[in-house]
Amino acid sequence: MKILSLSAFLLSLKLSLVGVVFSLHISKKAEREINKVFEIDNATFVQTLDQDIPGIDKDRLYTIFDRGNALGFAYVGEASSQTDTFEYLVVFDTNFAVKKAKVLVYREDYGSEIGSKRWLKQFLDKTPNDRFAYRQNIAAISGATISVKSMTNAMNNLMISLASWQNNGKPNKS
């Protein structure tokens, strides 16, 4: 019983500190999007990884909780555009199926069409076993070729890293 109490205490301590950790890497905009995806008012976020894994920095992947129940995961990444970078959010369910992909910050004058819901819906319901190929299962956008290829590569790299992590000891949440 004491071990369970200690575990509960440590989890609550981690949850209470997560606001500080989370705000360093994710914006209020991302937080609002995550709350909308899960139809909740105030999600809690816990850093999922204790250390970096190949392809994923530990401070970019979060487990999403509502009232102590794990709802899914959020990944905040950065990808290259023509002359700068853009930030994006990928929200997963507990089985790592994509529930939402969103471009959070796009810093270029051209190519911002990759932020459209219509284009990003191509990633919905995909899992770490799926792969993406520009002009095969990912549509091109005139004037946004570099950003489209960059987002496609970023999603591929994320899925490959998640698949590797799942296959090397991380338990599946199903």
Write out the residue ranges for each language-model feature:
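Bacterial N-terminal signal peptides
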Residues: 7-18
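Positively charged n-region of N-terminal signal peptides that target proteins for export
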Residues: 1-7
